[in-house]
Amino acid sequence: MKENKNSPEYPRTKLLPGVLFIVLLIILDQITKIVAVHFLGGGQNVILIPGVLEFTLIHNSGAAFGILQNAMLFFFIITAAALVMIFFILSRTPSARRYLPMRLCLYFIAAGAVGNLIDRAVFSYVRDFIYFSLIDFPVFNVADIYITCAAFTMVLLTMFYYREENDFSFLSFK
């Protein structure tokens, strides 16, 4: 029989270190946006790798690819729901080293969500500034990188690392 990850041998994750890490990530995101506004605010682009990567500032009042323009209430509700879910999962996650990758992914997703939420609350748009011109990808920011990379990593972890039947038993209400 496998050990129960809800048992006392698996103490819960302490939230304070994670919250401090999230705050640090949010600060980093906001600093990059401030720097982008300072250097790109006049409409100029900075080409880092010609035909591949450049910095260009846009004000995005929607989501990726320009969808959901000016849907502020929707973004606030979705972000709040995501943060509640993330902190619920974190509060129940065992502190075992095995769950560190999952915790880190959740920290990055939370930081990205809050970073963009701050922009929406303060400016009514998100400050995006990283542009991959090679594939004409939508302009994005550091918070978007946090969310995308962490979500992709979570999918991989779920597929290849957390494969045992009881790996997520700590989320059960039993």
Residue ranges of model-derived segments:
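Alpha-helical transmembrane bundles and membrane-interface segments of multipass inner-membrane proteins
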Residues: 1-174
